[in-house]
Amino acid sequence: LLAGRMRHRDGAGHAGVLESGGVQWMTAGRGVIHSEMPEQENGLLYGFQLWVNLPAKDKMMPPRYQDVPAASIPEVKRPDGIHIRVVAGKVDGVPGPVTDIVADPLFLDVAIPPHSSFVQVIERGHTALAYIFEGAGTFGVGDGEAGTDIAATQLAIFDDGDLLEVQTGDEGVRFLLIA
């Protein structure tokens, strides 16, 4: 959740309030009844809701809920000004707080300043996607080919590969990277 407050309750007894910068990770598994209600009195409610398809063998697992406050999400700050919030997976040896996920995802919130470059290894067998929600950049897969210019509100999907490269021009870019 980038801005606002959201209350979660579900039939398994889980409850929590998600605040700006926090993450809620829920596994529906064999099924769960839940509600999410905005709690802010005024202002912006801005965030993302993503669904991960479980492997067939895990679709009937018990429901699970994890509320991660913003302060529990580590931020990798590189010397070149790149900031990476690590929700799940690992970057520069820093693990994200969301663990024990059967799909083993990489889930990052990446901010790259103007005139910078970013490279991220993507595990073989994983498809990667980048949703750009601020700014613009050139996204490529490290194959020597020219990248593709992608701007805010656009989604890029990358096939199985080892490397994602992002270059910024006069404006920076912020995006979710999920693999």
Where are these regions (language model features)?
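Short, conserved beta-strand element in jelly-roll/cupin
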Residues: 1-6, 51-56, 107-113, 125-139
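Conserved short histidine dyad/triad with adjacent acidic residue
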Residues: 2-10, 28-30, 90-96, 106-123
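Short acidic (Asp/Glu) patches
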Residues: 4-14, 20, 27-40, 66-71
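Short acidic-glycine-tyrosine-enriched beta hairpin
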Residues: 9-27, 122-124, 128-131, 136-169
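Ligand-binding loop in jelly-roll beta-barrel domains
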Residues: 13, 29-58, 149-152, 159-179
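Generic beta-strand structural signal
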Residues: 16, 22-24, 34, 44-48, ...
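A short, N-terminal "cap"/entry segment at the start of jelly-roll beta-barrel domains
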Residues: 37-44, 54-104
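Structural beta-strand/beta-sheet cores of well-ordered domains, especially the beta-sheet scaffolds
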Residues: 46-48, 82, 106-108, 116-118, ...
